[in-house]
């Protein structure tokens, strides 16, 4: 509503050169990689976990994708002609690395029994350094029109990143609703001990969700590097873990595990992107955006805490007792 008031044409969509354009389409495109990561984060949080390494995993995937395009050469910074490396090879390399990162986190958490925030903190720090090692600390450019289309291209007039985000949502929705995985995730996050006694291999469930968020992060890294036609390992996916967590909690998923909502996460991601877009168009310094996002996370966590729920329950019980008196 704020955007609509100050920019009356915010929701207008036009067709130019066969493409859908407008502020709304740009918002959906920019929200796509954040939504993809947030969907994976939803499943992780549903198992009572957390992953703060998603930005670094995106950086690793993006760096390896560009490095594959360049044939592993970082000795020159400018592009040297159009690359002919097959797109499928680029994607396989990037997503395989991202999946391995997720597997690493999953093993540390499920097998080694390290706390999720500590386990993913390891890769958050080391992963960013690893991505910078891949690129030699440089911003690597490339020329590969097919790969670039994943970030700036369109299918049937709609930006490709939107298709990728919708496809990711549908795939995760199908996996969690048409297979037992969704129920296993909820039972693992709701009561891991009871779930384990009932025969659920909670270790495998946790490893699966961390591999899934690794793949989501890798796909986001591909979109990021395809969008700007370069790889800057120091900034790919920077702070996106905060945005993903915020989208999940705004969407109604409980940080205590168990209950989750993929549809709610979609709404949360769009709200976050709208907020970012609004602040940028109003020339608000980026540091205030980060402060606001962190504040919302803290407030939501407080509201979801057992102490607040206990106080709310007691207050509701007193009101009911008075009404019956």
Model-flagged regions — what are they?
Residues 217, 228, 232-294:
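Transmembrane alpha-helical segments in multi-pass inner-membrane proteins
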Residues 1, 5-8, 170, 197-204, ...:
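Cytosolic-side transmembrane-helix boundaries in multi-pass membrane proteins
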Residues 75-124, 267-268:
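Alpha-helical transmembrane segments within multi-pass membrane transporters and channels
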């Amino acid at each position: 509503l704020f955007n609509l008031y100050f920019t009356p044409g915010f929701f207008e969509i036009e067709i130019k050169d066969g493409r859908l354009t407008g502020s709304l389409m740009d918002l959906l495109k920019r929200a796509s990689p954040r939504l993809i990561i947030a969907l994976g984060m939803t499943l992780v949080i549903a198992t009572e976990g957390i992953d703060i390494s998603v930005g670094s995993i995106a950086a690793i995937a993006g760096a390896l994708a560009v490095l594959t395009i360049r044939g592993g050469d970082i000795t020159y910074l400018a592009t040297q002609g159009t690359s002919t490396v097959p797109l499928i090879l680029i994607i396989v390399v990037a997503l395989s690395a991202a999946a391995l990162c997720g597997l690493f986190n999953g093993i540390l958490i499920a097998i080694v029994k390290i706390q999720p925030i500590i386990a993913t903190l390891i890769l958050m720090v080391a992963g960013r350094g690893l991505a910078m090692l891949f690129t030699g600390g440089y911003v690597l450019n490339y020329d590969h029109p097919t790969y670039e289309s994943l970030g700036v291209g369109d299918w049937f007039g709609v930006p490709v990143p939107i298709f990728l985000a919708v496809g990711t949502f549908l795939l995760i929705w199908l996996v969690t609703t048409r297979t037992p995985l969704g129920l296993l995730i909820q039972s693992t996050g709701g009561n891991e001990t009871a779930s384990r006694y009932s025969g659920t291999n909670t270790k495998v469930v946790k490893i699966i969700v961390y591999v899934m968020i690794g793949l989501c992060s890798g796909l986001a890294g591909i979109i990021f590097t395809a969008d700007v036609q370069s790889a800057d390992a120091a900034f790919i996916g920077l702070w996106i873990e905060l945005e993903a967590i915020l989208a999940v909690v705004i969407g109604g998923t409980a940080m205590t595990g168990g209950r989750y909502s993929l549809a709610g996460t979609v709404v949360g991601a769009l709200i976050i992107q709208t907020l970012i877009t609004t602040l940028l168009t109003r020339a608000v310094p980026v540091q205030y955006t980060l402060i606001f996002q962190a504040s919302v996370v803290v407030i939501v966590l407080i509201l979801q805490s057992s102490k607040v729920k206990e106080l709310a329950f007691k207050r509701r019980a007193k009101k009911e007792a008075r009404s019956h008196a």
